[in-house]
């Protein structure tokens, strides 16, 4: 995947949104580029940007399978809460099946 120019997204910081916390959710099929885009966005936005990656939590940290009652969900919820309190921008990325992760999306509102 080619390097993407996310410079225009940095303008969000100077157009009256400086003190607003933001949540970016990237969902999609496996191999669609979610993680690549999420990492590029985090780099473009710079410090105080938190990236929550479903695969990192589920596969790397907890080593559990995805599913309706995955133990990854409570940790992701806690990370979302932490990010809302402590980061200007939170990026959540993963396949994030809406039937299994609806509680996580409820935290976004």
Task: Label the predicted regions.
Residues 38-86:
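Conserved substrate/cofactor phosphate-moiety recognition/catalytic segment
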Residues 29:
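P-loop (Walker A) phosphate-binding loop of NTP-binding proteins
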């Amino acid at each position: 995947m080619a390097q993407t120019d996310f410079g225009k997204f940095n303008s969000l910081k100077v157009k009256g949104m400086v003190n607003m916390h933001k949540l970016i959710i990237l969902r999609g099929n496996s191999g669609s580029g979610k993680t690549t885009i999420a990492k590029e966005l985090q780099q473009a936005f710079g410090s105080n940007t938190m990236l929550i990656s479903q695969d990192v939590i589920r596969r790397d940290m907890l080593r559990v399978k995805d599913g309706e009652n995955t133990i990854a969900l409570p940790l992701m919820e806690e990370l979302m809460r932490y990010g809302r309190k402590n980061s200007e921008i939170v990026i959540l990325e993963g396949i994030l099946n809406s039937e299994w992760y609806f509680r996580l999306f409820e935290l976004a509102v």
